[in-house]
């Protein structure tokens, strides 16, 4: 089966594992998936991220995070820019997710950044996803 949007597949796997309350998720690795996973870790949405090298492309192991009573830290993830309809944001129009409670992941000339980092560095780019 040919996968047309590996980023959407990655976000869907995280969403499904989160809804099923799994502790660990393994997905095939790519540079953009590694970047998204590192942003989720840095922003506190996941516990840890490990990249396991193998003879092929590698595997990303994501350790999901839950609250004291088992409530989900990630409420939802939404793919914004899709292969059929790319969504770009100028530096003045970088989106806020739920008035700053969530994050927007943006692919910029400076690499993958959150919406806050993009505003600080004064750059725009392709809006990859929203996480809240």
Curated annotation (Swiss-Prot):
Molecular function, one GO term: structural constituent of ribosome
- Keyword Cell cycle in the entry? The reply is no
Q: Which family does it belong to?
A: Belongs to the universal ribosomal protein uS8 family.
GO CC, sorted alphabetically, is: ribonucleoprotein complex; ribosome
InterPro entries per UniProt: Ribosomal_uS8, Ribosomal_uS8_CS, Ribosomal_uS8_sf
Which keywords does this chain's UniProt record carry?
Answer: Ribonucleoprotein, Ribosomal protein, RNA-binding, rRNA-binding
By its UniProt entry, which Pfam families does this protein fall under?
Answer: Ribosomal_S8
Q: What is one GO biological process annotated to this record?
A: translation
Q: What is this protein called?
A: Small ribosomal subunit protein uS8
Q: Please give the Gene3D superfamilies that the UniProt record associates with this protein.
A: 3.30.1370.30, 3.30.1490.10
- Describe, as the record does, how this protein assembles with itself and its partners: Part of the 30S ribosomal subunit. Contacts proteins S5 and S12.
UniProt organism field: Streptococcus uberis (strain ATCC BAA-854 / 0140J)
Q: Which residues belong to the signal peptide in this entry?
A: none
Function according to Swiss-Prot or TrEMBL:
One of the primary rRNA binding proteins, it binds directly to 16S rRNA central domain where it helps coordinate assembly of the platform of the 30S subunit.
Extract the PROSITE patterns matched here: RIBOSOMAL_S8 (PS00053)
Quick check: keyword Ribonucleoprotein in the entry? yes
> Which PANTHER family does its entry note?
40S RIBOSOMAL PROTEIN S15A
């Amino acid at each position: 089966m040919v996968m047309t949007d590996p980023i959407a597949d990655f976000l869907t796997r995280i969403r499904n594992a989160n809804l099923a309350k799994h502790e660990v998720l393994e997905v095939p690795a790519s540079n953009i998936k590694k970047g998204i996973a590192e942003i989720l870790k840095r922003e506190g949405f996941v516990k840890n991220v490990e990249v396991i090298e193998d003879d092929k492309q590698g595997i990303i192991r994501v350790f999901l995070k839950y609250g004291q009573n088992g409530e989900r830290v990630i409420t939802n993830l939404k793919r914004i820019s899709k292969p059929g309809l790319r969504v770009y944001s100028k530096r003045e129009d970088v989106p806020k997710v739920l008035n700053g409670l969530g994050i927007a992941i943006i692919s910029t000339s400076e690499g993958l950044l959150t919406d806050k980092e993009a505003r600080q560095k004064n750059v725009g780019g392709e809006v990859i996803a929203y996480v809240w």
